Swiss-Prot record:
Coiled coil: none
Keyword Transmembrane helix part of the UniProt annotation: yes
Predominant localisation class: membrane
Organism: Xenopus laevis
Keyword hit for rRNA-binding: no
Gene encoding the protein: rprml
UniProt keyword terms in alphabetical order: Membrane, Transmembrane, Transmembrane helix
The protein's name: Reprimo-like protein
Family to which the UniProt record says this protein belongs: Belongs to the reprimo family.
Length: 112
């Protein structure tokens, strides 16, 4: 929930309660950050954020998150493929070692 939604909701509540405009002004001034604080030297304490640096920071965060996500996905994929290949080769190794028993031929001939 952002601050503007909160402030507009409070404004509407105050307006419906038929309070004076002075109460409305003090409510808006204390909550939404629009009230300026002036120091002894005449400067203001409210700093306007540099939107460009915020945008660049967000883009870098998104790029790093995408790279890390792709790294994890490819790691899981290649690990799964490697395990699949190893299990397949182990199955083939076991199949080659198995030889039919001599008794199998006798049973087949005995049935006829």
């Amino acid at each position: 929930m952002n601050g503007t939604f909160f402030n507009h909701t409070l404004m509407e509540q105050v307006a419906y309660n038929n309070t004076t405009s002075q109460d409305l002004g003090s409510l808006m001034g204390c909550c939404n950050g629009s009230q300026t604080v002036i120091t002894n030297d005449g400067g203001s304490l409210i700093l306007i954020p540099d939107e460009r640096s915020l945008f660049i920071t967000r883009v870098v965060q998104i790029a790093v998150l995408c790279v890390l996500s792709l790294t994890v996905l490819f790691g899981i994929f290649f690990l799964g493929c490697n395990l699949l290949i190893k299990s397949e080769s182990m199955i083939n190794f076991l199949v080659k070692d198995r030889r039919p028993s001599k008794d199998v031929g006798a049973v087949i001939l005995g049935l006829y």
